[in-house]
């Protein structure tokens, strides 16, 4: 007869809850990543189950569907090696939870939330449901104040507010991984005079990074980049590799967002959550849907993909009574560069803008190849201006957009009629176009520009045009910044100014 000590030890190892668990040996069939169970008493939707294999290994799964005494379970580690007759199933009685702690910063976890950095086990401060807690819409606060990425084309023209969700639309072969790593290295709060010392302190900012379906080389790139540049101590990294079970990709972003919610709402940090690649997530969703033999929607994706994506994207934001915020930047690769594909199409409906990575700019050796014309930040107005960035930010952004669009039109006209037929204004626009792409959009992978350096650089480019052509900037702002003597030009000393100096 087993001793009381042995019984207690076994209970601790198996993590028994207060309610006794029920074990079953009633596996009916296996279909892809799904296990169909019969004769189950009171199964619960989203309940976590443990599968005990004949070789002694244990795999975890989640109840996807309940019909009477039947249950469909998706196995996170895959169903390879699962024996229909000899596998036993333990029902835990609760949904999937992740242990969270401030010690998660500087750690690396796999797609199931287990540490893979050879560090000690996490001493949990709390256990959170990975599906998150519903937020009362009335308690949400409108996103305000800017998160600085150090990239001029984002900070200057598509500013990101704390609590915003804005995706990066990329494609195969484009440097979205390098852009994501650069944002992680450089992102922070705007340094500005404030009475709230705690809110503006760099220790009050952290990053949660989740990679789904990446290859080993990409995973090593992210880890090495964070470690070498000293930003790793403020980053929590979740890695789901390409050779990991596809089904694991469905829970990886939810684990990352649960960690973000703990850091934002319990430790009151400003958290930037980066999710890459959401295309891999959607493909995993399609695989599960096909295994369940559901009626497919557009291009084989499930009809509920819009709802499913919203359960991820809508977890960004700010909550009344908490100083923290969750800002979300999901990255997705558009199949065949098609922005009408269901994944970017549905993502654009849910999120608050987009940042567009352009193949033509990439082919012209411009990094980061962000095309600002199709890019948009819908909450930019609330993140910029006097007291948050600078009083000229909004007007400068509008003028840059206008002149860049005119320059693109002039370039198209030049290819048809030749440069000799262009007007003086068109030639100035062409000059601006070249310098804007080579000096403003283009910057080094390790070049971190503050928002003030970005605005100064923008003014040095706008001085290519006579003052009367800058029709989108009020006279008061022009008086303050147009003349060289009243502008800060440290960041723009390498830009040639072809206009005479204003008096």
Curated annotation (Swiss-Prot):
UniProt cross-references to Gene3D superfamilies, sorted A to Z: 3.40.50.12240
Keywords: ATP-binding, Hydrogen ion transport, Ion transport, Membrane, Nucleotide-binding, Phosphoprotein, Transport, Vacuole
InterPro entries given in the database record: ATP-synt_VA_C, ATPase_a/bsu_AS, ATPase_F1/V1/A1_a/bsu_N, ATPase_F1/V1/A1_a/bsu_nucl-bd, ATPase_V1-cplx_bsu, P-loop_NTPase, V-ATPase_su_B/beta
Membrane topology: Peripheral membrane protein
Main location: membrane
Cited SUPFAM superfamilies: P-loop containing nucleoside triphosphate hydrolases
Subcellular location(s) of the protein: Vacuole membrane
Quaternary structure annotation from Swiss-Prot or TrEMBL: V-ATPase is a heteromultimeric enzyme composed of a peripheral catalytic V1 complex (components A to H) attached to an integral membrane V0 proton pore complex (components: a, c, c', c'', d, e, f and VOA1). Interacts with rav1.
Protein name, per record: V-type proton ATPase subunit B
